[in-house]
């Protein structure tokens, strides 16, 4: 190493001496054409030509060559001696989104020719799309309003056809769609209504562009009450570990700007990095609590000592979090705000403000650094130290009042081709300790590369320190050093410059410099107007061609403010108004702009903050913001035609050194590459390269490089009053409380102004408004937010929940607020209504309220009607001689009475039940039902060629296109809750449509074990296979399914055992043994998923090996582990059933029948079937269904046919359907008016028969498909509203069967089908189903419940119809298969804590027809206002309880099984919100696999009648 350092300068000097010295080519014609390496179609692009010293007229031409065609871009005839200009050209749209093409530039004259060919990337211009909703969150039954905005890459509006727009709910259902939408002037507004009972959660609007890309915008649907005030937590953003105190303030501010009175509770915590759930809160975090009253400004401040938070300890997170709750005075409404402060070990920090990434030998290297403390505050008058070893530089300097310091480093004697600079303030602390943090003083590091020049002539651009603001002209200094020996007799030197932005050349220019004798050094300035055309990143290139053909230059990168050319303004006049008054909204923008306006209640934004639509978000849509290099597909090194340097190797001390080209040095070519520009030139832009030597002359060992190897650094040049004219009314009635007030389109006049007169809503709040404007000339513009505060000094407001239960009393609170300077006496009245019963808390006629005071009046209200019930409350200032304190109350001249009318949703009492009716109606399929025959059905096969064979056939009602009908009778049980019934009717064009949209939510029951996770995993494979086979798979559906597969794969590994097997709850639940059945399920699913996601082969190999070890000598498999579903044990031959299941799994992987494990397993099954045929007892239906499918997979058609024949002897044939039942199934409760869905095991076994039919080899015959169709009709009737079934295994097997059947019968050529549903009365609705909307969920509410309806389908294909009937019932004692008792401790309202806390004790046992249940779920609903204490729920997890969950006001307890022995479960609940006259809550226990085996009970809080007084 030492030799290398000593010899290094000598070798560098040697290379310099080897440069040619007779390179003068003065007067030789020079050509330089610069074109971006990325070109967009259908938009103007530029290429810049520089031709100098021409001695004849030449033609410059550019052509683009693709695999399809050659296209001329431009042709210029140049007669001038010197020329510099940029040519614009436009490429047509390409059939592919992007492709690499060859660009050829030719300069040709009578005596000379220059031609060069290189690659460029050509991309089709992408339209930029974004969506704006009128607000971020919606309630049920509200209308969602949204806008689609389409722009080109210059932000100008587009007229474009959008193929598809749709809205997707949280379950993945497509609930609204628009096809082939013509968007004009870049904007389209759409709306759709939410149903009364939509899924709650995150929705999204999806826009599919013509190019195939999509844009998405989320919104939320919830039941909510808007917050009236904001809780602001104010604390430092950052503190250092040396801080001893931190100031925290909590403030409450109403949306109309007034302070909130009340009390604050503040919890300040520093969490552990690795918290524990075992020891309560203190094992999660170190916390300190504070509380106090808010002051007159609505704030509470606390100086907190940081000692408790142990800022110097490592085991904590590096932040302190604050959660503050403000309880409003009078209403007890409590809202929460959060804040956090970061903890840093950085005490001081140095950073480079302006510094070049390159250096030029002989020119001082300068820069500027900034010193700040840990909080980012500049530190003045501090000494800092600068070190640059390669330049042998050590110095110090002092920061100025802004914390800045400049430095300069001499580069004349620099070693090597790069410079590393270190700037430090203080040395780091020498003290280190385990789990302790040390203070840090961050140094600044920078590396700069040497710029190569043959003549040591340079031009360089001065760095700028900051983002450049729009609307101003920026001066850029260009410095130059020019050697006289190369300038010779030149009179003037022209510098050329280009500015690139968004990947294209946008500006160009020149600067002429008079040439003086000798060496020249100086600078000149260039003025750059900063506008939107060069945002968000501008790259500036400057260069000049010297007389000898050398090109000198530099490039710089500047961050530009995100600005838009269309300057939009928005303001309200006046800025503060009374409710229901008139106001003006003034919009200013470019003339003739189309402006979209929006004004939203600030409370909505407090409820759900949204990402602000800003210039930055629009710029983020750009596919190319900055072309920092060549695209990777064209990033090969350009051919260098310049001469290489040849010389001998150097021998020193017996070692041979050979020179290499230095990779760190920058040359003109690298500056052009930084710009993303392809250069076509005969000038010298490359540094000299070493001529390659024969390989045999090289020394392979102990070779030292003539230049050090360093990583090349990227270039970084980072641098309230009322309007007197508005008179308030004497009395106000306020009933209009929109959440979105303004949602309009207006066109700005030719003067650039538009005024809208608006009526202010009745909400006392602040409205936040914005405008989005589009102009053909200037493009997009966005206004700053405009605010209008709506206020009156005397008003009343109501505090109500989102909804209440009929008959359940709640407290209605009306708060009267007086912001007048004087006291007033107020009368408050609640208008009586037959819809509710109201009892005032206090019988008081009037209340005294002084300035800035309030009074809350309460009523105990019991609703009597369902739906939206209006509450009307009036507050009136009355005349009185009774003093308010020492003051005589006044009656305001204006606004003496305020009336507010607000609705409240009243929901039915009791237990909600849902009944699903499914139908698969097929007016035209290959197989059509003709009617019943001998208790079964007859089907006819219509081959397509026989569509018009005979006249008789044409009139056959079963022919394709015939009408197929089915009746629908909606009935209600006698114990139905009055007015609670509602029904909806849905149409889908695909048999798997609902399931493929809901693969994560197929079951309406909890998930929490390894089997349930696989039930979510496996259907994704079947859906992907089905969509692939039917050519319906879209990129969006594929990505969603693959996401689910990846997450399911990772989750399933949690349940893996060390030996490769899997169990229901994994090893951590104390299960020492894997489960044979579940391991087989996982094995086949992982194997099938390999085609879509990465699956580690080790998991498959280990599971297969483990299963092989369980195979007995007769080929059958031993059962190990606990089966949660004991229905699989219900057959006569447990071993055969399990072996059949495992054999199926192995064949589905797929393993060949010749595989030893499979071959032996098939021997087991064949032997078992022979024994069953010969024996008198036969075989269980479940077992036979599995055997039929196993033999079908194995290709044993003889055995398959035998087993199917036996199965059909036991089939149940009714209503044109076929299915199978178990001989001894559990007794079902018979009091329901509707037959419950079939048990899980019966769906599963019936689905296996479908698979046996459609897996017939080599292909299913018409008879197989005929029978499969009959079975599918029955299976489809068992689906739930999510597309799943009762439980896990039936869902997995049935969806597998439906996907195979769907693929076997699918046709893409079908025409439309028309669906009609009509009642016996006047209601009738039609739907159209075709290929384009077959995945769209079309839905309508049914008006008559109870009622009689008929459903009919005409046209072609099968249509899946689903009706959902919901109603509430009052539960009653019955003969349940479970014994369930619920008690509360205490049972009565005794003791000081009974109002706020009690225990729920559950006793459960199984008394059904079986020895024990399968896995069971206990679902405990909380009474209103109470929440479970999670640690007490977690403590239930012991031998019989596998898992617990707390979700959506429910506690879910998983039981491995329930026997006749009583199991007792107890946990604690705490009061969250006081509620009066609590209704009982429901507890339900049910068998996970036999969901019709259940029991319900109810419990009441100990203090149900008076708990609201707590």
From Swiss-Prot:
InterPro entries in UniProt: A-macroglobulin_rcpt-bd, A-macroglobulin_rcpt-bd_sf, A2M/Complement_sys, A2M_N_BRD, A2M_TED, Alpha-macroglob_thiol-ester_cl, Alpha-macroglobulin_TED, Ig-like_fold
One Pfam family of this chain: A2M_BRD
Compartments it resides in: Secreted
Annotated spans, Bait region: 692-730
Molecular-function GO terms, alphabetical: endopeptidase inhibitor activity; protease binding; serine-type endopeptidase inhibitor activity
Cross-link (Isoglutamyl cysteine thioester (Cys-Gln)): 1009-1012
Protein name (Swiss-Prot/TrEMBL): Alpha-2-macroglobulin
Gene: A2M
